Amino acid sequence: LTNSGSSANLLAFMALTSPKLGDRRIKRGDEVITVAAGFPTTVTPVIQFGAVPVFVDVTIPGYNIDVTKLEDAFSDKTKAVMVAHTLGNPFDIAAVKQFCDKHGLWLIEDNCDALGSRYFIDGEWKYTGTIGDIGTSSFYPPHHMTMGEGGALYTNNLQLKRIIESFRDWGRDCYCNSGKDDTCKRRFTQQFGELPLGYDHKYVYSHFGYNLKVTDMQAAIGCAQLQKLPAIIDARKQNWEYLREKLSVYGNKLILPEPTENSDPSWFGFVINVREDAGFTRNEIVDYLEKNGIQTRMLFAGNLIKHPCFDEMRTKKEGYRVCGDLTNTDAIMSDVFWIGVYPGMTRKMLDFMIEKIGEFCHAR
C-alpha cells in the first residue's frame, strides 16, 4: 500500500530504475512507450527521472493505446511500456504483453481507473493490473473504492516487491515489516557498500527513496471497502450499460464508448465524443449539462503535450518523442468529455442525465 495512486505510479516506475535490476534497469535517456491522452501522473515519473516518454496515438471509441503503433515506437533505447486502462476499459493487454515479451521490456499497468476489470488472456480471465510486471491502483474518493486517499501496487516478482517497498520506505534496504526486527536473521552480520561490517541493516539505504506510506486507519477503511467492492463494480456496470442503451439513439451526433474485445470492464466513467457534424461542440454541450447540475470531466489531459508543463520541452523539441501523429489524441482534446457512473446514482438520476443530453441534441 501507498498514499495515493500517483505515488503508486511513481514507485512502479522508480522500481525499474534500481541498480539491483542490472542491465534491465531504466537509465536516464532510456525510452518508455506511453500515451498523451491520459492522466499526467502515468507519465510524470518518466520525465522527472530523466527518461524519455515516447507517445503513440490511441483508438476511438476504445480510448486506449493503439497497439498497431508499438513496433514503430520501439528503438534500441526502449525499456518499458507504461499505460493506463482508460476509465475501466482494458487496453489490448494480449498485444501489449506479446510486444513486451518479444523485446524484453517491462510492462506497468496503470490500473487506477479499472479496479475489478478483467481481460481474457492465456485461456483464462485475469484481473487488469495483475498481467504486467507491476500494476497500480488509486483509492482516491471518486474511484471504485476509497481509503480517503491511498494507492496500491501489485507484482508477482519478489525482487520488484522489495525494491518497491524500499523506495516507499525512505530507500532502506531492510524489508522487515513495521514493528518487526531481524527477519533476515543477519541484521548485524552483513557488509554493505563501504559501511563497517555488521552495520545495522535497518539503517542501510540501497535507494534514494521517499516516505510514501499509508496509515493503518486508511488501510482499515480499505479493508471495509473491499467487502463492498463486488456490489460497487456491479452497480457501475449497470449504470454504464443503461446510459449506453438509452443514449444510442443519439449515435448520429455522439460517438459512444465501446469495450475492448475479450474484456469485462469495471467502468469508471462514460465517455461521450461529439461528432464533427453534430451541429454543436463539446464545449457547448458541456456548458449546458453543467448549468443543469450535471458534472462533466474532460478525458484527463486530452493531449498532455499541449499543456503548459510541456511548453519548454515542446519549444526545445527535447525530452520526449512522438511516434507518428496523434490525430485521435487531438480529437479527444477537442471533442471528448465523460460523465459519471457512480454506484450511488439512482435510476432517476440517470434518467435526468439522459433527458438533458437528449434535450440538447434535439435542439441542435
Regions from the PLM with identified roles:
Residues 45-46, 99, 127, 217:
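Hydrophobic/aromatic ligand-binding patch that stacks against planar heteroaromatic rings
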Residues 52-62, 297:
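Short beta-strand->loop structural element characteristic of the AMP-binding/adenylate-forming
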Residues 1-31, 44-49, 55-56:
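Phosphate-binding glycine-rich loop
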Residues 5-6, 68, 80-84, 93-95, ...:
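PLP-dependent aminotransferase class I/II
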Residues 38-43:
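Conserved coil-to-alpha-helix start sites within the AMP-binding
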Residues 34, 55, 107-109, 137, ...:
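Hydrophobic residues in well-ordered beta-strands that form the structural core
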Residues 61-162, 338:
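Active-site phosphate-binding strand-loop segment of PLP-dependent enzymes
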Residues 49, 102-103, 292:
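Helix C-cap/helix->beta junction micro-motif
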